[in-house]
């Protein structure tokens, strides 16, 4: 029989590695969130999760959406259910949006511009989420 904690630790490790290998910086403390969010420019925040729609839709969309002429200056991630304090601090910036994971938040100069919430991810194809993110990049980001 598989040890559940061992299994979940492996799932979490793989989820972390997948988003970091896509070029996102992990924010694991409230202080790291503060530091990242006070930077000028645009920041895409991927709220990571261990749910199926995170692995099958959100993380692939996070990886592929940034291959676009206009993209955010900064790519960061917090992990809901794992780095709880960092995630809670990040969500304080997402005014007007209820907590959801997985999700994406686009910030400009530390202020929320828009979000792609779980209900816009779950049940959708990765390409639909990529297209939505890239439309936000087109409106709010500059060519890098």
Swiss-Prot record:
Q: Which residues form the signal peptide?
A: none
Q: Report the InterPro entries cross-referenced here.
A: BrxB/BrxA
Q: Which GO terms describe its biological process?
A: cell redox homeostasis
Q: Which PANTHER family match?
A: BACILLIREDOXIN BRXB (PTHR40052:SF1), UPF0403 PROTEIN YQIW-RELATED (PTHR40052)
> According to its UniProt record, which protein family does this protein belong to?
Belongs to the bacilliredoxin family.
Protein name per UniProt: Bacilliredoxin BC_4151
- Name its species: Bacillus cereus (strain ATCC 14579 / DSM 31 / CCUG 7414 / JCM 2152 / NBRC 15305 / NCIMB 9373 / NCTC 2599 / NRRL B-3711)
């Amino acid at each position: 029989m598989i040890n559940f904690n061992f299994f979940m630790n492996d799932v979490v490790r793989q989820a972390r590695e997948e988003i970091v290998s896509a070029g996102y910086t992990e924010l694991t403390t409230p202080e790291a969130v503060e530091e990242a969010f006070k930077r000028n420019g645009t920041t895409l925040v991927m709220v990571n999760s261990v749910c199926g729609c995170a692995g099958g839709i959100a993380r692939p969309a996070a990886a592929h959406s940034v291959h676009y002429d206009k993209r955010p200056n900064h790519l960061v991630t917090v992990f809901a259910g794992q780095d709880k304090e960092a995630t809670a601090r990040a969500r304080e910036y997402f005014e007007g949006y209820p907590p959801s994971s997985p999700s994406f938040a686009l910030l400009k100069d530390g202020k929320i511009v828009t979000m792609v919430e779980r209900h816009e991810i779950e049940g959708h194809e990765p390409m639909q989420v990529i297209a939505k993110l890239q439309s936000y990049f087109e409106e709010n980001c500059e060519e890098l």
